[in-house]
Amino acid sequence: MFSSGVALLTSYMLVLLLLAWPLGIALTRLVDDRLPLWLIRVESHIKFLENSQMKWQTYAAAILVFNLLGAALLFLLMLFQGSLPLNPLHLPDVSPLLAMNTAISFITNTNWQAYAGETTLSPLSQMLGLTVHNFLSAANGIAVAFVLMRALTRTGSQQLGNAWVDIWRITVYLLLPLSVIYALFLAQQGVVQSLMAQISVPGLSGVEQHIPLGPVASQEAIKMLGTNGGGYFNANSAHPFENPTALTNFVQMVSILLIPAALCICFGRVAGDNRVGSALLWTMGIMLSVAALLIMWAESQGHPVLANLAVDQQMSAIQSGGNMEGKETRFGLWASSLFATITTAASCGAVNAMHDSLTPLGGLIPMVLMQLGEVVFGGVGSGWYGMMLFVFLTVFLAGLMIGRTPEYLGKKIEIYEMKMVTIGLLIPPALVLLGTALAVILPQGLVSLQESGAHGFSEMLYAFSSAANNNGSAFAGLNSNTPFMNITLAVLMFVGRFGVMLPVLAIAGALIEKRHQPASAGSLACHGPLFVGMLIGVVLLIGALTFIPALALGPIVEHLTLWQTH
């Protein structure tokens, strides 16, 4: 029956590539400013779309100011939602610390949720606040990816682009059209789209039930396309009003990685060599496939505690088998395992099953995918430029081995670039490890744990890995709505996002000044199986050296203990 999981993974990858290829071609027009003439004429009448080129410092300042202003407005919207319209359930104002945490979460594309959406936020807060920032945070990540692409393929300090123009075009010409089509499809499939607060129906026991509704389809579309992940409902994509059918589940999985995959194809075309984009796509695809198969295998083994209770966990024609705790029967084991892989490989964080109920090894894989820096496809834009940091490190190490100055696409990778690469690669793991250590030492952190021992440590490690790498998913046994967790995780989300984004922009600013050097016999070919293997090795080596000690205290020891005692 494992063949069913392999077939699902294979069909998923084929559909993803078929859809990503034309989208990647379309994205090259946004990178290269090749728009239809009529659009250029329309933009010429919009004052802030004067396409004056920015230096990297100006671009970075624009991104920071834009996001800080957005966070302030979102914070105020939630802080005073009780006095604002479109609040049919008369939900109270959100507490200041939770509002601050949520605002930072959504501007950083993390979408960490320390609240239940249907009982905490009004439709106005969900639509005007969260949904808007789902678009803007995604556009910010893609814009920074565009800047690095231009830096690698152009020469001249005034060729990096304009932040306002990039964000406008990405939002209006890419994200909005795709989201409208996607939302209509979701609504047709049964995803709720209503301004009604709730509907009352008689339950099976005769007691009236109040079922919350809301403008879900419109938020769900960009939630997945923008690798945001924050659900309208607390159950996220496990909720039938967000993800009702096997078809919507498959489409949601494809939509998570659609833009990240398309950016790899786009990069190859912008660089004038499709092979460099394909190398990144192969690297990410191999790592994703291996991770998915590992989770499927781990979950298919079942749970030893349930086995001792004589619970039937065997696969058959009438049940998925394996560890079905925390999973929806309409999706089954294979689709739930693949979704868990995809959502943590990307910085999405949406879930269609409870990750806290995964087996120890099944929960280990999503944790590792986040700890690698969200570079296995990763978030829209951020996954691509995060992987490029590893690419620069790989060519640097290769250059050291053969005694040549490292270069990529004909541009030399020198001391300044490697300093920025080091900063970008070290900040997220440092935040994860220091934050986790602080949380398990201080009583203010320990009060959030409902579990003790290895699993309790795993819950805390997962939370800080998710926040620092802007994923947003969680092991749900952790109570994160405390002053300590709200403040600490907000700091991690902000620094984890901009602590990587700013070094990437600095690298772009340095590379744009350099001229392309012609390739020689000693130049490293940045494509082909050898380069893909080297890149995978560097990514795994950095992750293994950094996190194996922490993982040994959590999921690894939990697995050994669980299977030994049962």
From Swiss-Prot:
<keyword id="KW-0997">Cell inner membrane</keyword>
<comment type="function">
    <text>Part of the high-affinity ATP-driven potassium transport (or Kdp) system, which catalyzes the hydrolysis of ATP coupled with the electrogenic transport of potassium into the cytoplasm. This subunit binds the periplasmic potassium ions and delivers the ions to the membrane domain of KdpB through an intramembrane tunnel.</text>
</comment>
<keyword id="KW-0813">Transport</keyword>
<feature type="transmembrane region" description="Helical">
    <location>
        <begin position="331"/>
        <end position="351"/>
    </location>
</feature>
<feature type="transmembrane region" description="Helical">
    <location>
        <begin position="530"/>
        <end position="550"/>
    </location>
</feature>
<dbReference type="Pfam" id="PF03814">
    <property type="entry name" value="KdpA"/>
</dbReference>
<dbReference type="GO" id="GO:0008556">
    <property type="term" value="F:P-type potassium transmembrane transporter activity"/>
</dbReference>
<keyword id="KW-0472">Membrane</keyword>
<dbReference type="GO" id="GO:0005886">
    <property type="term" value="C:plasma membrane"/>
</dbReference>
<protein>
    <recommendedName>
        <fullName>Potassium-transporting ATPase potassium-binding subunit</fullName>
    </recommendedName>
</protein>
<comment type="similarity">
    <text>Belongs to the KdpA family.</text>
</comment>
<feature type="transmembrane region" description="Helical">
    <location>
        <begin position="128"/>
        <end position="148"/>
    </location>
</feature>
<comment type="subunit">
    <text>The system is composed of three essential subunits: KdpA, KdpB and KdpC.</text>
</comment>
<dbReference type="InterPro" id="IPR004623">
    <property type="entry name" value="KdpA"/>
</dbReference>
<feature type="transmembrane region" description="Helical">
    <location>
        <begin position="361"/>
        <end position="381"/>
    </location>
</feature>
<feature type="transmembrane region" description="Helical">
    <location>
        <begin position="167"/>
        <end position="187"/>
    </location>
</feature>
<feature type="transmembrane region" description="Helical">
    <location>
        <begin position="423"/>
        <end position="443"/>
    </location>
</feature>
<keyword id="KW-1133">Transmembrane helix</keyword>
<feature type="transmembrane region" description="Helical">
    <location>
        <begin position="6"/>
        <end position="26"/>
    </location>
</feature>
<keyword id="KW-0406">Ion transport</keyword>
<feature type="transmembrane region" description="Helical">
    <location>
        <begin position="276"/>
        <end position="296"/>
    </location>
</feature>
<keyword id="KW-0630">Potassium</keyword>
<keyword id="KW-1003">Cell membrane</keyword>
<dbReference type="GO" id="GO:0030955">
    <property type="term" value="F:potassium ion binding"/>
</dbReference>
<feature type="transmembrane region" description="Helical">
    <location>
        <begin position="247"/>
        <end position="267"/>
    </location>
</feature>
<feature type="transmembrane region" description="Helical">
    <location>
        <begin position="383"/>
        <end position="403"/>
    </location>
</feature>
<feature type="transmembrane region" description="Helical">
    <location>
        <begin position="492"/>
        <end position="512"/>
    </location>
</feature>
<keyword id="KW-0633">Potassium transport</keyword>
<keyword id="KW-0812">Transmembrane</keyword>
<feature type="transmembrane region" description="Helical">
    <location>
        <begin position="60"/>
        <end position="80"/>
    </location>
</feature>
